[in-house]
């Protein structure tokens, strides 16, 4: 079996693709993959590290306002389609899967026009422009939020969930918090603002230090590498809480999640998939800087089921953050109920569901 995959720009499009690749490899050890991305995108570095064959095309995203750049983008799209067709003709895949980001546009479009079975996987509650465009041409659209269904041709939509959920659930032996000098007997909160960190979350954490010092729970706080030095200087000046460990980045984060009781994070699709699969209660602070404010819609899908406390960035403060944490961590019943509600929204077999869609197409 041969499968071509495309998706990139952010980890939210790349990691679900890699999780799906692992699922197929588990079932078919001799499967061959080709990943098509951009030369300068995050996907090249991540995918090649996994020893997956990688080819690149040149493509940029559309601007939302009319501009000459969009004319250039159309030209790049057409060139990308031509190049994708040559890659696909050489590789001869049984199916092509796009996981979002503008790079998958020319690749999946080319595959559809060549008559190759195609799937797009939409991770968010509000779909991106590329997947909406591709939905007219592909065989199936796999979604992770019921809210996304109305944006696609209904006869093509299949609810699969995010394969990243299957990956975190499959981790049998997690890493120990003792690596960071944290107690394995205390309730633990993980705070992080995405791969690059988030300045507003960092500000709130710094501001809540005096109150945090008096709490019996502990915090593992990830600043993001670009913010680390500035945050450490401020914590040194203010006096950091003894029950908090601060790191710039957490490699292999999924391996630590089973030791975490509550998460404070943005509301990206990967985060939602992971915490719902594991049943981890959360305080979600959606990024307002994403397309169509889709993170807030993601967050509300948990908030409306009382599976998360949602704080908008405009209302975030140290006081509000510690209040939200206290509501969950200091009440065993609340913690237990939120964990159960969160887990009820998870799709731990998402990778297997997406694989089933692929198998159906190949018949």
From Swiss-Prot:
Protein name, as recorded: UDP-N-acetylglucosamine--N-acetylmuramyl-(pentapeptide) pyrophosphoryl-undecaprenol N-acetylglucosamine transferase
InterPro entries reported in the protein's UniProt record: GlcNAc_MurG, Glyco_trans_28_C, GlycoTrans_28_N
Enzymatic reactions: di-trans,octa-cis-undecaprenyl diphospho-N-acetyl-alpha-D-muramoyl-L-alanyl-D-glutamyl-meso-2,6-diaminopimeloyl-D-alanyl-D-alanine + UDP-N-acetyl-alpha-D-glucosamine = di-trans,octa-cis-undecaprenyl diphospho-[N-acetyl-alpha-D-glucosaminyl-(1->4)]-N-acetyl-alpha-D-muramoyl-L-alanyl-D-glutamyl-meso-2,6-diaminopimeloyl-D-alanyl-D-alanine + UDP + H(+)
A single BP term in Gene Ontology: cell wall organization
Native source species: Bacillus subtilis (strain 168)
GO molecular function, one term: glycosyltransferase activity
Sequence similarity: Belongs to the glycosyltransferase 28 family. MurG subfamily.
The UniProt record lists the keyword Cell cycle: yes
PANTHER family, per database record: GLYCOSYLTRANSFERASE (PTHR21015:SF22), UDP-N-ACETYLGLUCOSAMINE--N-ACETYLMURAMYL-(PENTAPEPTIDE) PYROPHOSPHORYL-UNDECAPRENOL N-ACETYLGLUCOSAMINE TRANSFERASE 1 (PTHR21015)
Residues at which UDP-N-acetyl-alpha-D-glucosamine binds: 10-12, 124, 195, 295
Compartments, record wording: Cell membrane
Primary location group: membrane
One GO location term (cellular component): plasma membrane
Task performed by this protein: Cell wall formation. Catalyzes the transfer of a GlcNAc subunit on undecaprenyl-pyrophosphoryl-MurNAc-pentapeptide (lipid intermediate I) to form undecaprenyl-pyrophosphoryl-MurNAc-(pentapeptide)GlcNAc (lipid intermediate II).
EC nos: 2.4.1.227
């Amino acid at each position: 079996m041969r499968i071509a995959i495309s998706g990139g720009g952010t980890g939210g499009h790349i990691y679900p693709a890699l999780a799906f690749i692992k699922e197929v490899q588990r079932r078919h050890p001799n499967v061959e993959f080709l990943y098509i991305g951009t030369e300068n995108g995050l996907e090249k570095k991540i995918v090649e590290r996994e020893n997956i064959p990688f080819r690149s095309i040149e493509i940029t995203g559309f601007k939302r306002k009319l501009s000459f750049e969009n004319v250039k983008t159309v030209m790049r799209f057409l060139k990308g389609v031509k190049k994708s067709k040559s890659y696909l003709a050489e590789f001869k895949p049984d199916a092509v899967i796009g996981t979002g980001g503008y790079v998958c546009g020319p690749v999946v479009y080319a595959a559809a026009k060549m008559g190759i079975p195609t799937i797009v996987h939409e991770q968010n509650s509000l779909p991106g422009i590329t997947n909406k465009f591709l939905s007219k041409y592909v065989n199936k659209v796999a979604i992770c939020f019921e809210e996304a269904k109305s944006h696609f041709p209904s006869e093509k939509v299949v609810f699969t969930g995010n394969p990243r959920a299957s990956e975190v659930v499959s981790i049998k032996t997690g890493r120990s918090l003792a690596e960071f000098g944290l107690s394995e007997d205390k309730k633990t909160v993980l705070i992080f603002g995405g791969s690059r960190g988030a300045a507003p979350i960092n500000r709130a954490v710094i501001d809540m230090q005096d109150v945090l010092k008096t709490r019996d729970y502990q915090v593992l706080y990830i600043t993001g590498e670009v913010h680390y030095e500035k945050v450490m200087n401020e914590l040194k000046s203010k006096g950091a809480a003894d029950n908090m460990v601060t790191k710039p980045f957490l490699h292999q984060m999924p391996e630590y999640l089973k030791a975490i009781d509550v998460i404070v994070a943005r509301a990206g699709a990967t985060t939602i998939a992971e915490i719902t699969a594991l049943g981890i209660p959360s305080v979600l602070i959606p990024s307002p800087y994403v397309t169509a404010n889709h993170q807030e819609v993601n967050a509300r899908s948990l908030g409306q089921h009382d599976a998360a406390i949602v704080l908008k960035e405009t209302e975030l403060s140290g006081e509000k953050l510690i209040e939200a944490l206290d509501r969950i961590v200091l009440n065993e019943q609340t913690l237990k109920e939120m964990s159960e509600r969160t887990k009820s929204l998870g799709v731990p077999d998402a990778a297997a569901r997406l694989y089933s869609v692929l198998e159906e197409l190949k018949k």
